[in-house]
Structure formats: structure tokens, C-alpha cells
A protein has these predicted regions:
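Carboxylate-rich, polar loop motifs that coordinate divalent cations or form catalytic acidic clusters
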Residues: 1-192
Length: 192
């Protein structure tokens, strides 16, 4: 059965496997047995999942950073914040992860937006001029990143800059929840 009482993300990978995140970590659906297997290595509240072009799955967690997992090789790697290393994650509370249409990985943490450099296996925390660096969700639309934060919605165009939307622009609220955004098949974006 599915572990934990809450699920945060459901993700179908390129091999049609179904992954579900929960309060206790990550679960993999077994179609033949119609049940779930807990991935034992990851014991953390896990919020989001995405898959890179090499087949690695990336899991964002609350408090334990970001995990990379290669399902075929069964190799795990944990990325955490290290205040002595400027190329580490900005914070261990990772709310969301997005692999964009160019294959670039973006990570939303409680302390900023990070961009992953695969060649150097390092992160760059972007110096965005926004009212809150607590990035809750990231959605891509036509190469523009939409970031939800705890103080508004941000439209970020890489290489160009940001525009912040607040209640004065028509938002019902400026506070958003981690990984509570979706781009539907019709192109509409839903945020919460």
C-alpha cells in the first residue's frame, strides 16, 4: 500500500512507471500486483519529481535537499545546502524541481531559485530581485518561468529579468503552497 497519509506529486516517467511522493518519501506503483513499493532509501517528506534527459529522477524534499536517482542503475545522490560552498543548493527545503524544454534544471528552495549546471554538478543561486525568495512552484510556458512565492507570482524570463504580480494585479492571494501549480494540456496554468 501507499505509505503516509498525504501524497504531494504523481509522476509518470519515460518508461511509463508511476512514482508518488508522500510524507514518508517516494513510492513506485507496481502494475502487475496493483500495489505500491516504498523506495526505502529516501525517508523524507517529498514534494516534487521530474526527470532529466539522462533518465535520472529528481526528488525535492522538505529539509533533506534534493535527491537524484537513476532507476536502472539504482544509484542515489543527495544534494544539500553547504554554507561553505557557494555552488550548493540555496536551502535544504526544496519545494519544487523543473526540467525545462531545453533540458535545463531549475530548483525552487525556501531561499531562492537555483539553476543546475550538469557539467560541473553544481548549483547557481540566481540573484533575482523579488519580494520573497521562498520559491513554491515553477511552471514553464514558452520559455518563460512562472514562479509562485510567499509574496506573489513572478514571471521570470531567463536572461531578461522578472516581473512580480500581486493582489494589485488581480491575484486573489500573494501566498502560494509548495508544488501547487499545473500547466494543463490546453496551455492554461493553474496555481494555488
Amino acid at each position: 500500500s501507499l505509505d503516509g497519509t498525504s501524497s504531494y506529486a504523481i509522476f509518470k516517467d519515460r518508461k511509463e512507471r508511476i512514482w508518488v511522493t508522500s510524507m514518508s518519501g517516494v513510492n513506485l506503483y507496481n502494475r502487475e500486483k496493483d500495489n505500491f513499493t516504498r523506495i526505502k532509501y529516501l525517508d523524507a517528506l517529498t514534494i516534487d519529481i521530474d526527470q532529466d534527459t539522462k533518465g535520472n529522477l529528481w526528488f525535492s524534499t522538505q529539509g533533506k535537499g534534493l535527491f537524484k536517482y537513476h532507476p536502472e542503475k539504482q544509484i542515489w545522490k543527495n544534494y544539500i545546502h553547504d554554507h561553505k560552498n557557494p555552488n550548493s543548493l540555496a536551502n535544504n527545503q526544496v519545494n519544487c524541481v523543473l526540467i525545462d524544454t531545453n533540458g535545463e534544471m531549475w530548483v525552487g528552495t525556501m531561499n531562492g531559485l537555483c539553476k543546475y549546471n550538469a557539467e560541473e554538478d553544481a548549483f547557481e543561486t540566481l540573484p533575482l530581485e523579488i519580494p520573497s525568495h521562498n520559491i513554491c512552484s515553477i511552471i514553464e510556458d514558452q520559455r518563460i518561468l512562472w514562479l509562485t512565492t510567499t509574496k506573489g507570482l513572478v514571471r521570470y524570463t531567463p536572461g531578461e529579468g522578472c516581473r512580480v504580480f500581486t493582489k494589485s494585479d488581480g491575484l486573489q492571494s500573494e501566498q502560494f503552497l509548495p508544488n501547487a501549480a499545473l500547466k494543463a494540456s490546453d496551455g492554461k496554468i493553474y496555481i494555488g
